[in-house]
Protein backbone atom coordinates (compact mmCIF):
# COMPACT_ATOMS: atom_id res chain seq x y z
CA UNK A 1 0.00 0.00 0.00
CA UNK A 2 1.43 3.39 -0.93
CA UNK A 3 2.33 5.74 1.89
CA UNK A 4 2.62 9.08 0.12
CA UNK A 5 0.38 11.09 -2.18
CA UNK A 6 2.94 10.73 -4.92
CA UNK A 7 3.01 6.94 -4.59
CA UNK A 8 -0.80 6.79 -4.73
CA UNK A 9 -0.82 8.90 -7.86
CA UNK A 10 1.87 6.72 -9.39
CA UNK A 11 -0.24 3.63 -8.71
CA UNK A 12 -3.28 5.19 -10.38
CA UNK A 13 -1.21 6.27 -13.37
CA UNK A 14 0.44 2.86 -13.67
CA UNK A 15 -2.93 1.12 -13.62
CA UNK A 16 -4.16 3.26 -16.52
CA UNK A 17 -0.97 2.69 -18.48
CA UNK A 18 -1.07 -1.04 -17.81
CA UNK A 19 -4.56 -1.23 -19.31
CA UNK A 20 -3.52 0.81 -22.32
CA UNK A 21 -0.38 -1.27 -22.85
CA UNK A 22 -2.33 -4.53 -22.53
CA UNK A 23 -4.76 -3.32 -25.20
CA UNK A 24 -1.97 -2.54 -27.66
CA UNK A 25 -0.08 -5.78 -26.94
CA UNK A 26 -3.23 -7.86 -27.29
CA UNK A 27 -4.13 -6.13 -30.55
CA UNK A 28 -0.67 -6.74 -31.98
CA UNK A 29 -0.65 -10.40 -30.95
CA UNK A 30 -4.12 -10.92 -32.45
CA UNK A 31 -3.03 -9.48 -35.79
CA UNK A 32 0.06 -11.70 -35.83
CA UNK A 33 -1.99 -14.75 -34.82
CA UNK A 34 -4.52 -14.10 -37.61
CA UNK A 35 -1.68 -13.71 -40.09
CA UNK A 36 -0.14 -17.03 -39.01
CA UNK A 37 -3.52 -18.74 -39.38
CA UNK A 38 -3.82 -17.44 -42.94
CA UNK A 39 -0.40 -18.86 -43.77
CA UNK A 40 -1.21 -22.23 -42.14
CA UNK A 41 -4.53 -22.47 -44.00
CA UNK A 42 -2.83 -21.72 -47.32
CA UNK A 43 -4.56 -18.36 -47.80
CA UNK A 44 -1.39 -16.75 -49.10
CA UNK A 45 -3.14 -14.13 -51.25
CA UNK A 46 -5.11 -12.90 -48.23
CA UNK A 47 -1.92 -12.93 -46.16
CA UNK A 48 -0.13 -10.77 -48.76
CA UNK A 49 -2.86 -8.15 -48.44
CA UNK A 50 -3.03 -8.44 -44.64
CA UNK A 51 0.73 -8.13 -44.03
CA UNK A 52 0.69 -4.34 -44.38
CA UNK A 53 -1.86 -4.07 -41.59
CA UNK A 54 0.14 -6.42 -39.38
CA UNK A 55 3.38 -4.48 -39.86
CA UNK A 56 1.57 -1.20 -39.25
CA UNK A 57 0.13 -2.46 -35.96
CA UNK A 58 3.53 -3.78 -34.85
CA UNK A 59 5.27 -0.45 -35.45
CA UNK A 60 2.35 1.48 -33.96
CA UNK A 61 2.73 -0.56 -30.77
CA UNK A 62 6.42 0.39 -30.68
CA UNK A 63 5.59 4.05 -31.31
CA UNK A 64 3.31 3.99 -28.26
CA UNK A 65 6.24 2.77 -26.18
CA UNK A 66 4.66 -0.57 -25.35
CA UNK A 67 7.48 -2.53 -26.99
CA UNK A 68 11.00 -1.48 -27.94
CA UNK A 69 11.63 -0.49 -31.56
CA UNK A 70 14.11 -3.35 -31.93
CA UNK A 71 11.47 -5.82 -30.79
CA UNK A 72 9.08 -4.35 -33.35
CA UNK A 73 11.70 -4.75 -36.07
CA UNK A 74 12.33 -8.35 -35.00
CA UNK A 75 8.62 -9.20 -35.01
CA UNK A 76 8.16 -7.56 -38.41
CA UNK A 77 11.12 -9.48 -39.77
CA UNK A 78 9.66 -12.76 -38.56
CA UNK A 79 6.30 -11.96 -40.15
CA UNK A 80 7.96 -11.21 -43.49
CA UNK A 81 10.04 -14.36 -43.15
CA UNK A 82 6.87 -16.45 -42.69
CA UNK A 83 5.30 -14.95 -45.80
CA UNK A 84 8.42 -15.41 -47.91
CA UNK A 85 8.74 -19.03 -46.83
CA UNK A 86 5.09 -19.69 -47.72
CA UNK A 87 5.53 -17.99 -51.10
CA UNK A 88 8.59 -20.13 -51.86
CA UNK A 89 6.70 -23.30 -50.97
CA UNK A 90 3.81 -22.22 -53.17
CA UNK A 91 6.14 -21.59 -56.12
CA UNK A 92 7.89 -24.93 -55.60
CA UNK A 93 4.55 -26.74 -55.79
CA UNK A 94 3.50 -24.94 -58.98
Curated annotation (Swiss-Prot):
Keywords: Ribonucleoprotein, Ribosomal protein, RNA-binding, rRNA-binding. This is Small ribosomal subunit protein bS20. NCBIfam families: S20. Belongs to the bacterial ribosomal protein bS20 family. GO terms for biological process: translation. Binds directly to 16S ribosomal RNA. It comes from the Bacteria. GO terms for molecular function: small ribosomal subunit rRNA binding; structural constituent of ribosome. The gene is rpsT. GO terms for cellular component: cytosol; small ribosomal subunit. InterPro entries: Ribosomal_bS20, Ribosomal_bS20_sf.
Amino acid sequence: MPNTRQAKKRMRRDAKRRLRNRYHLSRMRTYIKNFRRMIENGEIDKAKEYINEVISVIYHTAAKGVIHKNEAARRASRVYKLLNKALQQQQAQA
